């Protein structure tokens, strides 16, 4: 994973990246499998007292703001969140609904798990969970809201990387044809709205 992260950072430094140029590098980490169960109930991704109560999460950074990290000027494709009241020192991350793990990619402080979901109307969508210290699932694994996907960094572990990585970067995706690289290569609202839902709005509408 360290080698993958080094190649990833080197590429961003020495050429002008685009989703079209970069996505094929990430395709090998993708498994194209169909979820066995529909995602008809949605939950917060943390072990909080009530996973249906939206104010049990704390939003640290919003969807759609502009970032200078990695690629200058890219748009934040997620919300960054933590439990409002963590129940333990180590914060675990859970799947938000029935689905299947379709990608585990990147390494170190950017480790990411992506879950593919099928809605009751047959529509396919994805949830993506980034900044994971430890991952407990693998590609092709069926998950539900009780599946522990990973755990987050502690503040102390985060310091090793010189940033504040002790939070969950949560994306709600319309599609995953970029195999993950749109997370850091989205530069305008057209690209943003083509692939991503606003997670804060999605949670408000579906977690209830």
Predicted region positions:
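Sec-dependent N-terminal signal peptides
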Residues: 3-12
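Surface-exposed, glycine-biased beta-strand/turn segments
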Residues: 16-111, 145, 158, 196-208
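Short, solvent-exposed loop/turn segments that connect beta-strands within catalytic domains
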Residues: 87-89, 119-124, 178-182
